[in-house]
């Protein structure tokens, strides 16, 4: 078994909506990013790549490459997952924690879990997504951006 950890953060800027966990969430602010700014899927992709010792999302999909401008993070996750599976790994489970003062994530979490399970080709029981605030402390608490942490457990597939 192998475990990976991922972290991502994006500052608010421009107009909404925002995309988190593949879900378009109405909000007056947008997120500044080279791709679609989906902190949840970026952190998850990093966790999966880390567990497989395959670097990180910036190595695989550099923000200096115009091909990834405005990229759909679900597509990036699926491509990273294909590469990880090709290395002989299967999914154990993933756990994602979104850190945001606003907007409220709870109504959107069920759909996030559906999208992640679809993209990884796994059962919903293998995907957990939760959200928390920082009780108005730090940059997320001041409403300056959104952060996310994720962990992933991979299992070496039998040969």
Curated annotation (Swiss-Prot):
Looking at the UniProt record, the site noted as Transition state stabilizer sits at 34, 133
Task: List GO molecular-function terms, semicolon-separated.
Answer: 2-C-methyl-D-erythritol 2,4-cyclodiphosphate synthase activity; metal ion binding
Protein transport as UniProt keyword: no
Pathway stated in the Swiss-Prot or TrEMBL entry:
Isoprenoid biosynthesis; isopentenyl diphosphate biosynthesis via DXP pathway; isopentenyl diphosphate from 1-deoxy-D-xylulose 5-phosphate: step 4/6
Q: Matching InterPro entries, A to Z? A: MECDP_synthase, MECDP_synthase_CS, MECDP_synthase_sf
This enzyme's EC code(s) = 4.6.1.12
List residues binding 4-CDP-2-C-methyl-D-erythritol 2-phosphate: 8-10, 34-35, 56-58, 61-65, 100-106, 132-135, 139, 142
Please, which domain of life does this record's source organism belong to? Answer: Bacteria
Query: Which major enzyme category is it?
Result: lyase
Q: What does the record list as GO biological process? A: isopentenyl diphosphate biosynthetic process, methylerythritol 4-phosphate pathway; terpenoid biosynthetic process
Function statement = Involved in the biosynthesis of isopentenyl diphosphate (IPP) and dimethylallyl diphosphate (DMAPP), two major building blocks of isoprenoid compounds. Catalyzes the conversion of 4-diphosphocytidyl-2-C-methyl-D-erythritol 2-phosphate (CDP-ME2P) to 2-C-methyl-D-erythritol 2,4-cyclodiphosphate (ME-CPP) with a corresponding release of cytidine 5-monophosphate (CMP).
**Protein family:** Belongs to the IspF family.
Quaternary structure note: Homotrimer.
Protein name as it appears in the record = 2-C-methyl-D-erythritol 2,4-cyclodiphosphate synthase
């Amino acid at each position: 078994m192998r475990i990976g950890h991922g972290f991502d953060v994006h500052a608010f800027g421009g107009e909404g909506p925002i995309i988190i966990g593949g879900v378009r969430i109405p909000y007056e602010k947008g997120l500044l990013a080279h791709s679609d700014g989906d902190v949840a899927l970026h952190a998850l992709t990093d966790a999966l790549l880390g567990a497989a010792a395959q670097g990180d999302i910036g190595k695989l999909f550099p923000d200096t490459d115009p091909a990834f401008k405005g990229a759909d993070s679900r597509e990036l996750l699926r491509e990273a997952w294909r590469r990880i599976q090709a290395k002989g790994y299967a999914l154990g489970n993933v756990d994602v924690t979104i850190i945001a003062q606003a907007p409220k994530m709870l109504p959107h979490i069920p759909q996030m879990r559906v999208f992640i399970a679809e993209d990884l080709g796994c059962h919903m029981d293998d995907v957990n997504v939760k959200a928390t605030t920082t009780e108005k402390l730090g940059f997320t608490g001041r409403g300056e951006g959104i952060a996310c942490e994720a962990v992933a457990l991979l299992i070496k597939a039998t040969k």
